[in-house]
Design a protein with these regions (language model features):
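Conserved SAM/SAH cofactor-binding pocket of Class I
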Residues: 99, 103-188
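A short glycine-rich, Lys/Arg-flanked "PGG" loop and its adjoining helix->strand segment in the class I
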Residues: 202-217
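Hydrophobic beta-strand segment of the Class I
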Residues: 192-193
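Short strand-turn motif at the edge of the Rossmann-like AdoMet-binding core
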Residues: 221-225
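Core SAM-dependent methyltransferase catalytic element
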Residues: 241-259
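Conserved beta-strand elements of the Class I
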Residues: 93-94, 127
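N-terminal auxiliary segments of SAM/dcSAM-dependent transferases
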Residues: 1-86
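Conserved short alpha-helix immediately C-terminal to the canonical SAM/SAH-binding motif I
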Residues: 156-160, 200, 227
Length: 259
């Protein structure tokens, strides 16, 4: 029986200068070091091809791609350069993603926004682990969280998230910290959002469990239908029970309660 063939696509922007070819070689070399098992491909099927797309510039390209997006029932994510027609009951989040992850376009971000809209109870204390642009922390605050601690390992993303928190007028509700783990949090919280990767979630699952109150909710995404089962299998051992699984294309979000 033949195995399915998967195509994995990486997208990025490189300046067109005399070092571009060197940068491309380095990128390909890094991709080539990834184990086939992590990519869920056959070692014999590994093949890297490169396509070129000319853009006017990163800022101009992002402004063409990132537009106002409606997610779920009432969440609207808009960049500063776009307009939105606000409807009664809408929760409008203004995000300039910069170089950080979290424009609202990615499937895993949309899944987390849908889960927040469905499950967040006003007044909760929340943690956004791997906040990126800050979009999920801001969504949690606008949906009624009393306090949100957003943590991020990338210093540049920390600054992007802080700017977006200010853009939405939520400095009194959201604190953004440069940290590597939810173990950074001192007292237990009611909600942890982790839109990162399956590997990072599994590596920090015990710390996430310790950060949550009994009955607290974990919203985990950034995983695909291929590696979500790896996370799901580990949840009971960490003291979680599954509540729901959401999918969007190949992407998955898991909701689980700490017992």
């Amino acid at each position: 029986m033949s195995q399915p063939t998967w195509t994995i696509r990486f997208e990025g922007y490189l300046p067109v200068d005399d070092r571009m070819e060197e940068r491309l070689r380095r990128v390909c070399a890094e991709i080539d070091t990834l184990p086939a098992s992590a990519l869920h491909i056959d070692e014999a099927a590994r093949l890297i091809t490169i396509d070129y797309t000319q853009v006017k510039g990163l800022l101009e390209a992002s402004r063409e791609i990132v537009r106002t997006t409606r997610v779920g029932e009432h969440i609207v994510v808009k960049p500063p350069w776009d307009e939105c027609e606000e409807q009664p009951g809408d929760v409008v989040i203004e995000i300039d993603p910069g170089t950080a992850f979290g424009s609202g376009l990615h499937e895993s971000t949309r899944l987390c926004l849908r889960a927040l809209e469905k499950y967040l109870t006003p007044g909760v204390i929340a943690v956004d682990f791997g906040t990126g642009s800050g979009i999920l922390a801001i969504a949690a605050a606008k949906l009624g969280a009393a306090r949100v601690t957003a943590i991020e390992a990338n210093p540049e993303a920390v600054e992007v998230a802080r700017a977006n928190v200010m853009r939405n007028g939520l400095e009194s509700v959201i604190e953004v910290h440069h940290a590597l783990s939810p173990a950074f949090i001192g007292s237990p919280v009611d909600l942890v959002i982790a839109n990162i990767t399956a590997e990072t979630i599994t590596a920090h699952l015990d710390a996430i469990a310790e950060a949550l109150n009994t009955g607290g909710l974990l919203i985990a995404s950034g995983m695909t239908i291929l590696n979500a089962p790896d996370v799901e299998r580990l949840l009971p051992n960490a003291g979680f029970s599954m509540v729901e699984k959401l999918t969007d294309g190949q992407w998955v979000a898991l909701m689980a309660i700490k017992q």
